[in-house]
Amino acid sequence: MATFKVTLINEAEGTKHEIEVPDDEYILDAAEEEGYDLPFSCRAGACSTCAGKLVSGTVDQSDQSFLDDDQIEAGYVLTCVAYPTSDVVIQTHKEEDLY
């Protein structure tokens, strides 16, 4: 099992947190375990509450059913169903930017 460095950036609050996330754990779950309060609602990849924007790196979010191909291509990620597949940097709290 690989572990990756996930950097979570909240531009509105000016915060940046780095956490280690195993490749078999969702980013949202790992962030919560570390005490970070990220937005979420369904926890199933079926809404946009937890949306973030991928700055660098790659994730597997094949469990999600909400984002369309254009949004995924633009770098949006649902942290509740995203596994890191490399070191990643994600801007959090991006739900409003989807629309």
From Swiss-Prot:
The keyword Metal-binding applies. One of its GO terms (biological process) is electron transport chain. Residues 4-96 form the 2Fe-2S ferredoxin-type domain. Binds 1 [2Fe-2S] cluster. [2Fe-2S] cluster binds at residues 42, 47, 50, 80. It holds the Pfam family Fer2. GO terms for molecular function: 2 iron, 2 sulfur cluster binding; electron transfer activity; metal ion binding. Keywords: 2Fe-2S, Electron transport, Iron, Iron-sulfur, Metal-binding, Transport. Its cofactor is [2Fe-2S] cluster. Coiled coil: none annotated. Ferredoxins are iron-sulfur proteins that transfer electrons in a wide variety of metabolic reactions. PANTHER family: FERREDOXIN, FERREDOXIN-2, CHLOROPLASTIC. Belongs to the 2Fe2S plant-type ferredoxin family. This is Ferredoxin.
